[in-house]
A protein has these predicted regions:
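Active-site-proximal alpha-helix that buttresses catalytic centers in soluble enzyme cores
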Residues: 1-280
Length: 280
């Protein structure tokens, strides 16, 4: 009789705190699947690696594994690297591994982000006094990727947060790979005339990049003393994030887990990336 297990595949980080946070998310996912073994592993930079997590599930008798990428958006790691590891393992050990999709643009993820931002607003109001959101600029900082589809999703989420919460304006920056980077983004925002700026890293976990985002925010506060710069907490293990992970697992069993490939540079001739069609 076939036995099913769940595998959460993370990128990995050199930050032990980030690695620990990912493990907590994987642990909390178990509450949604109390009868199913759940394990996790990382693509690089940390242990256990994905193969170790798969070994653990196989040792528990699992021969059918539902694997999901522990990532916000689908770029190279979620589209290429993790599937390569999973397919190689499945072929070697003769088991069935089905792969789900990334967290993506989802109402639950936007709700989680809004909660983090609202907590930052409340903290700013307690620190400096009440201020209208119409007089506040939201800055959403994404990871940044070589995939324009993933980058554009950060902009979409930022706009939905701005319009949904009522901010006067929103700007988007990235920690790497694409532009604008964090420091020039904050310099630009300082010229827009807003007296308060909320900086929200749209990241799942902490790490060097989140630390840098907060560092650039502190530097901007020093450079522009007339503006209130408030840092928001990243997503981490917000209950809505865990719910989204659980939904991605369930999608595999219902056959509704396909990634949106309409704007994937590996599948279609996306403007400026025509030469990368078929590289996946």
């Amino acid at each position: 009789m076939s036995k099913t297990g769940i595998m959460v595949c993370g990128h990995g980080s050199r930050s032990q705190e980030a690695v620990d946070e990912f493990a907590v998310v994987a642990e909390r996912l178990k509450a949604h699947f109390p009868e199913t073994p759940v394990d996790f592993g990382y693509l690089e930079f940390a242990n256990p690696v994905i193969r170790d997590g798969l070994d653990n599930l196989r040792e528990q008798g699992c021969d059918h594994i539902l694997a999901v990428p522990g990532m916000l958006f689908a770029a190279m790691h979620a589209k290429n690297d993790i599937p390569t590891v999973l397919n190689t393992y499945a072929k070697k050990h003769g088991i069935k591994i089905e792969y789900g999709r990334e967290l993506d643009v989802d109402p639950k993820m936007i709700a989680a982000a809004a909660d983090r931002i609202q907590a930052a607003i409340d903290e700013a109001n307690a620190k400096w006094g009440e201020r209208s959101l119409y007089d506040t600029c939201l800055v959403v900082i994404g990871r940044g990727a070589s995939d324009p589809d993933a980058n554009s999703n950060v902009s979409k989420i930022a706009r939905m947060l701005q319009e949904g919460m009522g901010f006067g304006w929103v700007e988007v920056g990235y920690s790497g790979f694409t532009f604008p980077l964090v420091e020039p983004c904050l310099d630009h925002v300082a010229k827009l005339g807003y007296s308060r700026v909320i900086v929200f890293p749209y990241f799942l976990f902490t790490g060097i990049l989140v630390d840098r985002i907060y560092g650039f925010t502190d530097e901007a506060a020093g450079k522009y003393p007339g503006i209130e710069f408030q840092k928001a907490f990243y997503l981490n293990d917000h209950p809505k994030v865990i719910e989204t992970f659980a939904e991605r697992v369930r999608e595999i069993t219902t056959g509704s887990n396909n990634m949106n490939c309409a704007m994937c540079k590996y599948r279609a001739q996306v403007l400026g990336f025509e030469a990368e069609v078929g590289m996946a």
